[in-house]
Amino acid sequence: GTYLYGLCGEGSLILAGLVDHLCTQQKLKGAGFVVVVPSGNEQAALLQDKGFQWAFPLRCLPREVDRNLWSQAEFDTVTAKKLCELRARFWPDTVQLPPEQMAVVLGDLYSSGATLVSNDNGYGIYFRKEDTLYFVEMMATGDRAAEILMEAAREKEVIVEKAVITVGAAQNLFLGEGTRQDYGMIRFEGEPFDVSESYMRLMLD
């Protein structure tokens, strides 16, 4: 597949023509699908006219984080290779960039103060702002495993009491909770396939 980003043009007609050209070229190169994260509603509407459909929705949910000295996890910087391995382990049906491009995404995250928390049952990437942890990605074997990661992060950061977590809408964490958010779109250049339980996040957007 192919990922489009940084789409811009002087007027919708020029941008529409650019999208058509790019998709045609990628199909000739063997791409079975093209994905994109639209910059806004106007661009999303244009992309829908060009055969793209919404996919990869997210859920954003706030949670109180209990204090628990027994919750253990490791804190480290994660390499692009390691993140791809973690995603393959906890959610194989993930659309993601190759490690070389993921390294750029991770570099931006860590220069902005992101921290990785992980153990054998999951991992999360978060920022701290005042008394709240903002998890931009979290994958774990279940709700309790995710709570342990948050509790360990609370002990490290000391002053936090709350967390805001962004997960894939179909993820098995805290099902039924949170506000659904649109994220990515997909256009099939070959035979369509089911992406209702697929995940895409932390792209070059």
Please place each PLM-identified region on the residue numbering.
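Beta-sheet entry/capping signal
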Residues: 1, 32-35
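A structural signal for short, well-ordered beta-strand segments and their strand-loop junctions
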Residues: 34-37, 96, 116-119, 125, ...
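Short loop/turn motifs at secondary-structure junctions
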Residues: 3, 30, 134, 157-159
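Active-site/acyl-donor-binding loops of N-acyltransferases
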Residues: 37-73, 136-143, 147-205
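Conserved acetyl-CoA binding element of GNAT-fold acetyltransferases
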Residues: 1-11, 130-142
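Conserved acetyl-CoA-binding loop-helix of GNAT-fold acetyltransferases
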Residues: 6-29, 36, 142-155
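Amide-forming acyltransferase catalytic core, primarily the GNAT-like/NAT-type
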Residues: 49-137
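A structural motif
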Residues: 28-31, 52
